[in-house]
Design a protein with these regions (language model features):
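Beta-strand-rich domain onsets/edges
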Residues: 16-76, 109-110, 135, 149, ...
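Sec-dependent N-terminal signal peptides
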Residues: 3-13
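Substrate-binding cleft and catalytic face of glycoside hydrolase catalytic domains
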Residues: 93, 97-111, 118-227, 233
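Short, acidic/polar
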Residues: 76-92, 157-169, 237-247, 338-347
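An acidic-aromatic substrate-binding cleft motif
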Residues: 36-38, 42, 59-106, 124, ...
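Noncatalytic carbohydrate-binding groove/subsite architecture in carbohydrate-active enzymes
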Residues: 74-85, 89, 197-320
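Aromatic-rich peripheral "rim/lid" segments of glycoside hydrolase catalytic domains that contact
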Residues: 34, 180, 185-218, 274-286, ...
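Structural preference for beta-strand elements that scaffold enzyme active sites
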Residues: 66-70, 97-99, 131-135, 176-180, ...
């Protein structure tokens, strides 16, 4: 019995090591990919008679994939010079879709926007040239706004400003076909959310549900042909399912349900069954499913959200004092990131209801919350992922 204990105990420790990823079973994933992501086709070529008698070589190249393999471009606007160009080159090696941050605080019509406007124009021109599809994120949110919006006292004037802002984004950037309409729609009144007048406007309209209906109806009155979607940080929140079900019942015109998955603490790392069951739960609503913001770090994860918050508070204080406080990328967690993402992408890609996966940070440079959440190091050299 003593020897059996010595055999089992190390195995238990190894299995509980948060840097170890036990490979997923992925039962049926390969077959589903063959069925839903590939197809047979017949190409007919009509040549003049004189050419038919000649031998030649035909080269066929896949220009793009229907599935959207994405990255969040929130880091790109902070890149300069050669780093900017290298970032885009690295992006093209694996991705065909990008989420462009268009938060109201960046696109504020009451401030000088020349630099950010040029950035957007340059990205759109580049995306057209390189067959990259874009998503604008978001048209409206209860965070990331200028102070004149946050502390607005006249709710009728605020409503005009909100609708003017959403119209301006849709009409100014017609090349962008995908838009997150209202980011995190069941989140405005969560305890951790800071005050904004948009919360007052939501109450003024009768609550979250009627306010969201009005927003969706408005953006569709501006342009009904866009791919409108929503997005939330916890798709497992039953309120998020309920509001999407309500949208469907109201016959609102939207194409996709967005799910975030920022796995920066051990309790947020999704298992194979959790990922699959979450997709299946939402698939019954008949909409495309987008994994909109994925983070799998190669830095040491926190045990839980409380530990994570303590770090974020210290990091915020450090940044206020002009000092960076980023978590280092560690070899054992780089192994985890690579093996976990291989399984995650395989499983999600195999489900016919999923239309996109967007990895939030391409690089550790300026990565969200200071985690080593990129697929590239800060110098833009690749990790194992």
């Amino acid at each position: 019995m003593k020897y059996l204990f010595y055999l089992i105990f190390p195995l238990l420790i190894f299995a509980q090591d948060p840097s170890f990823h036990e490979p997923w079973k992925l039962e049926g994933a390969g077959e589903r990919i063959e069925k839903y992501r590939k197809t047979n086709t017949i190409l007919n070529f009509n040549f003049p008679t004189d050419i038919k008698k000649k031998n030649g070589k035909l080269k066929i190249k896949l220009i793009n994939h229907d599935f959207k393999f994405g990255v969040g471009f929130t880091q790109l606007r902070k890149m300069r010079g050669n780093m900017f160009d290298l970032y885009l080159e690295r992006f093209k090696e694996a991705f065909n879709y990008a989420t462009v941050g268009m938060y109201w605080v960046l696109t504020d019509e009451r401030s000088s926007r020349k630099q950010i406007d040029k950035y957007y124009d340059d990205i759109i021109k580049w995306s057209i040239k390189n067959n990259v599809r874009l998503k604008g994120h978001p048209l409206m949110w209860h965070e990331g706004m200028p102070d004149w919006v946050r502390y607005s006292k006249d709710l009728d004037e605020l409503e005009v400003a909100m609708k003017t802002h959403m119209r301006r984004l849709i009409e100014t950037y017609p090349e962008i076909n995908d838009w997150d309409v209202y980011n995190e729609p069941v989140g405005p009144f969560k305890p951790h959310i800071p005050y904004s007048a948009i919360q007052d406007w939501i109450n003024y309209k009768g609550g979250i549900y009627p306010a969201m209906v009005e927003i969706y109806q408005f953006v569709n009155s501006v342009n009904p042909d866009k791919n409108y979607s929503n997005n939330h940080y916890h798709a497992k929140d039953p309120e998020y399912f309920k509001i999407n079900e309500y949208y469907v019942q109201k016959n609102l015109n939207f194409s996709s349900i967005g799910m975030q998955a920022h796995m920066q603490s051990n309790d947020n790392v999704m298992t194979e069954s959790q990922v699959w069951d979450q997709i299946e739960d939402y698939a019954v609503l008949g909409k495309n499913i987008q994994f909109t913001e994925i983070t799998v770090t190669s830095s040491k994860r926190f045990n839980n959200w409380k530990d994570h918050q303590e770090f974020l508070a210290k990091r915020d204080e450090s940044l206020r004092n002009g000092k960076e406080m980023d978590l280092p990328s560690l070899p054992e967690y780089e192994d985890f990131q690579a093996s976990y993402l291989k399984d995650f992408y395989t499983l999600v890609f195999s489900h016919p209801s999923v239309s996109s996966i967007t990895f939030w940070n391409l690089t550790d440079k300026n990565a969200w919350r200071g985690h080593a959440g990129g697929l590239l190091y800060k110098d833009l050299s690749p990790k194992k992922s």
